[in-house]
Amino acid sequence: LTVGGKQFEADGDPDTGATDYDITSFQHIYVVGAGKGVQLVVKAIEDVLGDYLTGGEIICKHGDPMLVKKVHVTMGSHPTPDHGCVEGCQRILNLSSRITENDLVFTVIMNGGSSLLTCPADGITLEDTIEVTRLMQIELGVTTRKLNALRNHIDKLKGGKLLRLFSRATLINLCGADLNRAFDIGKTDFQYLVKENYWLHNVPDGTTYEGALQTIKEFNVEERIPASVMRLLRSQSPENASL
């Protein structure tokens, strides 16, 4: 459900319907995620699962109070990322290397996850990523939709790539959105979400490399975007999405 909005309908989702999980059948149960309100969700998971929860890694905003005990919290910056964001992502990457088919993993993405879940792609520096956000969103006022069409493709985790890391495990993907009537996404089903998604990074991405280049061209900033970013975008198949 969206707060003050219409209900999400899972029509068209091949996995629609209630699912039962025998939590005693899993060797480990982890939580990973990022967002300004992610601790509220993770605390609820901790409260429900108790000792069945092994641990996990989440990234929150600097200044957030500590609400969770079993899951490790890394603090990062929003709206422009910092080294804390990268450190938290590296911890998620490290955790993913230990995951097996006998594990259950909750992924949780909340508002602010696009900044907090920042792990620059090979050849891209954190400073490059910061400059993209500063230029496009802070200076030029580009919408988050158009900004993410760009930064989803210069990152190791955004744009659904988080799912690949934990694909060996059984996954439960929780998507949170704090929306109001002024930002009502309307009646949304699964197929529309997958096609249009640009900010829920534990759902397949709906943006493309071609869309990223179009956004840069639209704002006439080819010469201002870091050269490493332009090289990466131009080297990829134009129509490919992140996942």
Description of each model-found segment:
Residues 1-108, 114-243:
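Non-transmembrane, aqueous-exposed alpha-helical and coiled segments at domain scale
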